């Protein structure tokens, strides 16, 4: 099966998304991941030099093809976190609209916020494909961790 996985976080970020995708490859599937630039878990929650200025936007690792959308680095503070989420959403949506490959199914691998998987919906609707959502929704806890007060929710 030819699978498109959409998740804001992928290797080298410290999330298990890469483990799942690599296991799917070991089981005989073709996997492409639409993801963002690494920044969560990186030094100062910033984008590493090897991903700046348009570098490494398409990669192949352990059989998985990786397509990277631009995004604002996570850094610290609630405003930066919101910019990070919105920039991935916007840029990955643009990328999803232009993917030429035909995938059999889309897997939305979503931590939070839920809009992370919208690029998968964009692709699935355009190409009339099924989409599976694997959701680890942490809202509103992720907002309080990002600096929003409990009273503001």
Q: What are the functions of these language-model segments?
A:
Residues 18-21, 46-49, 82, 120-124, ...:
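Short, glycine/charged-enriched secondary-structure capping and boundary segments
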Residues 14, 85-93, 105-129, 133-142:
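An aromatic- and histidine-rich active-site surface loop
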Residues 8, 73-80, 127-153:
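Acceptor-binding helix/loop patch of EC 2.4 sugar-transfer enzymes
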Residues 4, 32-34, 67, 107, ...:
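Hydrophobic/aromatic beta-strand patches that form the interior of the parallel beta-sheet core
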Residues 1-54, 58-59:
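N-terminal subdomain of nucleotide-sugar transferases
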Residues 25, 60, 121, 125:
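Anion (oxyanion) recognition and catalysis
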Residues 35-98:
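A conserved catalytic-core segment of Leloir-type glycosyltransferases
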């Amino acid at each position: 099966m030819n699978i498109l996985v959409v998740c804001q976080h992928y290797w080298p970020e410290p999330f298990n998304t890469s483990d799942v995708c690599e296991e799917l490859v070991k089981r005989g599937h073709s996997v492409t991941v639409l993801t963002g630039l690494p920044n969560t878990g990186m030094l100062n929650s910033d984008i590493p030099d090897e991903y700046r200025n348009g570098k490494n936007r398409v990669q192949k690792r352990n059989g998985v093809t990786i397509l990277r959308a631009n995004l604002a680095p996570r850094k610290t503070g609630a405003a930066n976190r919101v910019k990070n989420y919105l920039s991935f959403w916007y840029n990955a949506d643009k990328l999803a609209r232009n993917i030429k490959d035909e995938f059999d199914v889309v897997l939305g691998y979503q931590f939070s916020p839920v809009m992370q998987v919208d690029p998968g919906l964009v692709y699935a609707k355009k190409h009339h494909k099924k989409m599976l959502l694997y959701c680890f929704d942490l809202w509103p806890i992720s907002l309080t961790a990002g600096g929003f007060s409990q009273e503001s929710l």
